[in-house]
């Protein structure tokens, strides 16, 4: 069990029982060495199979797993029986099934979501607990622009960027997050005096002499007029 295959907070004493999954078998010079892993997504899947009978029985399948070992994980599950809620079955009553796995993984937070082949909906679910307002897909590039209300952006990104990183790993899409401006914000205007620290006073006076008092008025004014009348280029 190399250090690279251990959860960062793992600590073991000699003779202590370790739960892990076999990652690979190295056979060098006729000396086989079994390499174990606790950081592999497969380890989390095996723990789920042990804790959730419906997975072991084939009623629920684990479609995808993304992990930052010891920190956070996202799991996408699907049920083959309409009567079974796959997320509820994995979490258990009051979290009874998932809590044992969380403890085994050194308090790794685990989000369980419903899998769907609809990639737009899957991306929205992967970014939970944030609520997505709209998406712009670039399927050929495997990229997506996600628009959220300002108060939802930090939830989508997550602590240390973990939520968006895991969502990208789970969906296999590069996710760019943008703030969605409400209508009031879009309609707001700014008086030129508020730019005094960035723009020379004579420039502001020249623009105002044209009857342009706000930023939007300047943006909507013909470029030729600004150059000719206010001596701006």
Q: What are the residue ranges of the model-derived segments?
A:
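RNA-contacting regions in translation and RNA-metabolism proteins
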Residues: 1-233
């Amino acid at each position: 069990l190399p250090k690279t295959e251990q959860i960062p907070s793992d600590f073991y004493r000699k003779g202590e029982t370790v739960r892990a999954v076999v990652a690979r078998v190295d056979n060098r010079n006729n000396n086989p060495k079994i390499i174990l892993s606790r950081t592999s997504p497969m380890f989390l899947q095996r723990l789920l199979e042990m804790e959730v009978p419906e997975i072991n029985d084939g009623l629920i399948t684990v479609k995808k797993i993304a992990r930052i070992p010891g920190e956070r994980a996202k799991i996408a599950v699907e049920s083959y029986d309409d009567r079974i809620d796959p997320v509820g079955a994995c979490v258990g009553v009051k979290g009874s099934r998932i809590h044992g796995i969380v403890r085994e993984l050194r308090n790794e937070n685990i989000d369980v979501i419903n899998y769907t082949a609809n990639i737009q909906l899957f991306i929205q679910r992967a970014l939970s607990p944030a609520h997505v307002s709209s998406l712009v897909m670039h399927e050929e590039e495997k990229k997506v622009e996600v628009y959220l209300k300002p108060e939802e952006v930090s939830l989508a990104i997550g602590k240390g960027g973990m939520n968006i990183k895991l969502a990208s790993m789970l969906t296999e899409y590069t996710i760019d997050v943008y703030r969605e401006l409400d209508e009031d914000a879009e309609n707001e205007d700014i008086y030129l005096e508020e730019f005094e620290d960035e723009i020379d006073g004579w420039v502001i006076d020249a623009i105002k002499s044209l009857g342009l008092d706000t930023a939007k008025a300047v943006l909507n004014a013909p470029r030729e007029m600004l150059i000719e009348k206010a001596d701006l280029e």
